[in-house]
């Protein structure tokens, strides 16, 4: 007989749960036979006592199996099923370039993405700025686009890992979001449901990261790599820098515009380019599409230089309902904000530090992000042309450009971004873009 309270008691007492106990509890989350209070109690017990590696694998797999699983074998695809997941940040537009770049090199990328919440932008919101783009296609259309184009970026549907959605909603209101075991199971349940062969994780560190310290970022990356590999997906993680916005823009339409310009070769922010190439390279190596880092980077550069990656992005947009001429006339399709003006520093000096989370919250306050999951976005607004850490600036140097809907929101954003940037007498030491690569053993 299944008694949720006995499973809670075991974990409360720091004992190891069996695969059957975990499967029973997750089934109860899915069919509502387990109460919210019991989910909360188990979450708190796991928060304090953690999970053994094997328990964590069983939890991720049980949540994967709570809903529909995608299968690709029947399509006889001539390459591996690969994907990337980021813990999120500001100006993290990597997915929009990475998907088509990897597809151009022979990978198949069924990317299931999320919307933004709080200071972090969401890949889905950036693509939703494209007129007509359907982020929730029928499963057969999704499979067709992955097969024919090589990449499809869509949103999570209610039938994928439904246990995770209920578990997360409970964690969100019970101060248990930060549990590394539960973050790991939550991320991997959705990725495992997508039927991947290879997963590369981008775990951010710095003032705009989800994890509060470098040590916590490393702990999360190591756990995801171990659990992912334990669940049968070749998983690698990169710890990447998020002490300043990654791209030259933060917002929805403006980040999508930057992604198109990157793919077409019109503008490539060096920091964004390096992180994108590093993540793509690990996907190609993991999928056996490249022998090593140098081989992978050469193939990726060729995909950009030939225009193949840009062509694939355009085909994906069109296949999912967007304009057929999007790549040629993206400026016509992505509406600008009514107000676009710079904000200046109060004094000269070096850009010493950035509160990247604060910069993300400025985008949110402009209307480009969500405080609540139900908020409606203004795709036009955001920030661009950021100064960079270590840059020597004068009082006449713009800190960034603000794209606002009205004067009041411009003034509010200006106050926020000025407060988020520290000007020092001396330049800070340079930070690496990729701190560490963590591979499965």
Curated annotation (Swiss-Prot):
Catalysed transformations (reactions): thymidine + phosphate = 2-deoxy-alpha-D-ribose 1-phosphate + thymine
Q: Name one GO cellular component term.
A: cytosol
Q: Which Pfam families match?
A: Glycos_trans_3N, Glycos_transf_3, PYNP_C
* Keyword annotations from UniProtKB, A to Z: Glycosyltransferase, Transferase
- Transmembrane segments annotated in the record for this chain: none
Pathway, per record: Pyrimidine metabolism; dTMP biosynthesis via salvage pathway; dTMP from thymine: step 1/2
Recorded GO molecular functions are: 1,4-alpha-oligoglucan phosphorylase activity; thymidine phosphorylase activity
The Gene Ontology biological process terms listed for this entry are: pyrimidine nucleobase metabolic process; thymidine metabolic process
Give the top-level enzyme category.
transferase
Annotated InterPro entries: Glycosyl_Trfase_fam3, Glycosyl_Trfase_fam3_N_dom, Glycosyl_Trfase_fam3_N_dom_sf, Nuc_phospho_transferase, PYNP-like_C_sf, PYNP_C, Pyrmidine_PPas_bac/euk, Pyrmidine_PPase_CS
Q: Which SMART domains match?
A: PYNP_C
Signal peptide, first to last residue: none
Q: What EC number(s) does its UniProt record assign?
A: 2.4.2.4
Q: Which family does it belong to?
A: Belongs to the thymidine/pyrimidine-nucleoside phosphorylase family.
What interactions and quaternary structure are annotated?
A: Homodimer.
Describe the function of this protein.
The enzymes which catalyze the reversible phosphorolysis of pyrimidine nucleosides are involved in the degradation of these compounds and in their utilization as carbon and energy sources, or in the rescue of pyrimidine bases for nucleotide synthesis.
Instruction: Quote the protein name from its UniProt record.
Output: Thymidine phosphorylase
Source organism (scientific name) = Chromobacterium violaceum (strain ATCC 12472 / DSM 30191 / JCM 1249 / CCUG 213 / NBRC 12614 / NCIMB 9131 / NCTC 9757 / MK)
